[in-house]
Design a protein with these regions (language model features):
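Beta-lactam-recognizing serine transpeptidase/beta-lactamase-like catalytic domain environment
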Residues: 1-6, 11-248, 289-292
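Short, charged, low-complexity patches
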Residues: 137, 252-261
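Short, gly/Ser/Thr-rich active-site loops of penicillin-recognizing serine hydrolases
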Residues: 166-168, 173, 259-292
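Intrinsically disordered, low-complexity acidic/polar segments
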Residues: 240, 252-254, 270
Length: 292
């Protein structure tokens, strides 16, 4: 298990929209740092700042200040006073709604997830005490892709006898549903499509299938490279596949995106297998900069 990094930001977006602390018409200004609470400010990965961002732009640009401000508003009372516990409980509520408080249902041993229970501002951008397996993030990606359907995952499709007769069909079991307004899902989906078309188009521009995604980097130790993460689904308008990729100590999220590109080329038959499995390593980024 590791922290999810910025792949968690859609949860914060959903919480903010559902609780009414942000709307489609709101813009939050990013000047490069969030400094409304005592102590060291929380920096955006873009130190010069993103400027004014809508909810969709906040997701597409993975702006730390946008989601820190959203969490801050979640914790404010009617007088504007901020309460850590109030903000934290709302983030927990919507993380649980996305199924992040449950094991994924796989038929093998799996670590229990940890939804962050302290430090709401860092938690809103995927830090805090969050800790999830890759399979739990894959289930979360499926919830986003399906507009709220929480399924138990399975390693099996079906079992047959030696003659090909069906013994058991492992149809996905829907265990919950996140009942949100369609406008909220539209904002999240558009933001995740923007991650691809606005922020990472150079990687996917020659891929003949549309996709939506969310990148992430998670720091576990200052002495080791960040973990590289990328969740998503495709095609963007009618998902057939959802995924979560984590490369332990894999530096930038770009490296996970390159893995996803190979998977999609193979899954949709866009490239011959011999073009994908070359026996040679791809060029990878060894930058440890947090740009998502």
């Amino acid at each position: 298990r590791t922290a999810p990094g910025s792949t968690f930001k859609p949860v914060t977006a959903i919480a903010g929209l559902s609780e009414g602390v942000i709307t489609d018409n709101d813009y939050i200004y990013c000047g490069g740092r969030f400094d409304k609470l005592p102590g060291a400010p929380l920096n955006c990965w873009l130190l010069s700042g993103h400027g004014a961002l809508s909810i969709r732009d906040g997701i597409a640009n993975s702006c730390n200040v946008f989601f820190s401000e959203t969490a801050y508003r979640l914790g404010q009372n009617e007088e504007g006073t901020f309460n850590d516990n109030t903000a934290m409980q709302k983030l927990i509520q919507y993380a649980n709604l996305m199924g992040l408080d449950k094991k994924s249902g796989l038929e093998i041993s799996e670590a229990s997830p940890q939804v962050s229970n302290e430090l709401p501002i860092p938690s809103a951008i995927g830090q805090g005490t969050h800790s999830y397996t890759t399979s739990q993030l894959a289930r979360y990606a499926t919830v986003l892709a399906s507009s709220g359907n929480v399924y138990n995952l399975s390693l099996l499709d079906k079992s047959t006898d030696s003659d090909g007769n069906l013994i058991e069909d492992y149809t996905p079991e829907m265990i919950d549903h996140a009942d949100l307004s369609q406008s909220i899902w539209d904002d999240v989906h558009a933001g995740m499509e923007g991650v691809i078309t606005k922020s990472n188009w150079g990687i996917f521009q020659d891929l003949n299938v549309t996709l939506a995604g969310k990148t992430g980097t998670a720091q576990q130790s200052k002495n080791r490279a960040n973990h590289s993460l990328f969740i998503g689904y495709a095609p963007a308008d009618n998902p057939q596949i959802a995924w979560a990729i984590r490369i332990a100590n894999g530096y930038a999220s770009t490296n996970s995106e390159l893995v996803a590109k190979d998977i999609l080329n193979y899954y949709f038959g866009l490239k011959d297998e011999t073009e994908i499995l070359t026996g040679q390593a791809s060029s990878a980024s060894n930058s440890n900069a947090g740009t998502d």
